[in-house]
Amino acid sequence: MTAADRPLRAALLGVIAVALVLLGGGAAVALGIGRDEAPGADSVDVGFARDMSRHHLQAVEMANLVPERSTDPEIRQLAFDIAETQQNQVGRMQGWLSLWGVAPSGGATMAWMSGPAAGGHAGHDASAADGAPMPGMATDEELAALRGLSGTEFDVEFLRLMIRHHQGGAEMAQYGAEHAQEAAVRNLADSMAQTQAAETTTMTRMLTARGGTPLPAP
C-alpha cells in the first residue's frame, strides 16, 4: 500500500462501519435493494460499487484538502458539495456490498466493463490488477503537488484534477446505469452521470475564470 492509499483505506473503513450499522437495523429498504437474489461477485453491480467507491474516495480526499488551502468561497462550497455527495454515495455502495455478502474490494479493476466504453483505457480489461489506477484518478505525484499549493494556485490545480476525475468516472457511471441488474444501482449510476456532467461544466467555467486550462481528458 502506498502512502497515498492510506487516506483512502481509512475513509473506506469508516464508510463500511457506517454501512454495517445500517444493515444491523434492517436497512435493505433504505439502501433501495429489494431482490432476493444478490448480484454475483463478477457482476456489473458489484464491480461498479467496488470501483466507483474507490474512485469517489479519491475525490473526497481531494475535496478535504480545500478548507486549509483555499479562501475562495466558490471553491470551498464546491468542495463541500463534492465531499458530502460522494461520501454519501460510497456509504450506499458499501452497504450494498455488505448486504450482498461480497468483499468491499477485490477483482480486476474495471473488468466488469466490456465493449468500446471499456476498451479505450488501460486497466479496463480483465487482466488489470486489483487496485490498478482508474481513468481520471490523480497520481501520487499529482496529489503530493496539490498538497503543497495554496491560494489561487491550489484552486486552479484542484479544479484541473477534479474535472479530469469527473470525466474519468463518467464512463463507469454510464455503463453502470445501462448494465447493472439492480434498479437501485442503475438509478444511482444515472444520477452520478448527470450530476458529475453538470459539475464538470461548472468547474470548467470556474477554471476559465481563474485563468486555468483543463488537463487532457482521460
For each predicted feature, which ranges?
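All-alpha RGS (Regulator of G-protein Signaling) helical domain and cognate RGS-like helical scaffolds
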Residues: 2-218
